[in-house]
Design a protein with these regions (language model features):
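Extended extracellular/luminal ectodomain segments enriched in beta-structured repeat modules
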Residues: 58-65, 105
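Extracellular beta-strand elements of beta-rich domains used
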Residues: 120-123, 128
C-alpha cells in the first residue's frame, strides 16, 4: 500500500484511499477540467451542491509533506488531520504545501466546498519506523538473545 502514489483515482483506491466524488463526468466537462487541473495527478469533486471527500488512513509513525490545491475558479479545498482543520486552498490555487506528523490510524481528509476541486499534487511520507527499529536492533545486537526485543 503506497499512499504516496497520487497519479489517479484508480491507483489511489487500490492503495487504500477512500473517495466520495463524482465518477460519471460528462466528456466536455472532463476535457475542461483536465486543462485546468493538470491530469498528471489526482483531482476530484462531487457534482452539484454535495461535498466531495477524499480520505487516507496512515499505518505507521512519521512526518508528511502534502502539496495540494483547488483548481476550480471558485470554492475551497480544505484539509483535515484527525478531523482537525489544518489548511485550505481557495480558488485558482494550483499548489500549497503543508507538513504534519502522523501516527497509526491518523486520517487525512480532503473536502471540497462551494464547487471547489480537490487537487493532490504530491504526498511525501517519511516513516520513522525503519529508523526506530534499526536503532533498537543496533543497541541490542551485542547482548544475548534474551534481551533482544
Amino acid at each position: 500500500m503506497d499512499l504516496q502514489d497520487v497519479q489517479n483515482k484508480e491507483i489511489m483506491l487500490a492503495n487504500g484511499w477512500q473517495m466520495d466524488i463524482s465518477s460519471n463526468i460528462p466528456f466536455w466537462i472532463q476535457k475542461i477540467t483536465d486543462r485546468y487541473c493538470n491530469s498528471n495527478t489526482f483531482y476530484g469533486f462531487k457534482a452539484g451542491p454535495r461535498v466531495g471527500k477524499v480520505m487516507a488512513t496512515f499505518q505507521g509513525y512519521g512526518s508528511a509533506t502534502l502539496d495540494f490545491g483547488n483548481c476550480a475558479t471558485q470554492g475551497y479545498t480544505s484539509v483535515f488531520l484527525n478531523n482537525k482543520y489544518i489548511a485550505h486552498a481557495g480558488p485558482n490555487t494550483s499548489s500549497k504545501s503543508i507538513s504534519f506528523q502522523y501516527n497509526p490510524g491518523s486520517t487525512l481528509l480532503f473536502n471540497e466546498f462551494c464547487s471547489g476541486i480537490i487537487k493532490i499534487n504530491s504526498l511525501k511520507l517519511d516513516c520513522i519506523c525503519k529508523y526506530y527499529f534499526t536503532y533498537i536492533y543496533q543497541i541490542h545486537s551485542f547482548r544475548s538473545p534474551q534481551y533482544i526485543l
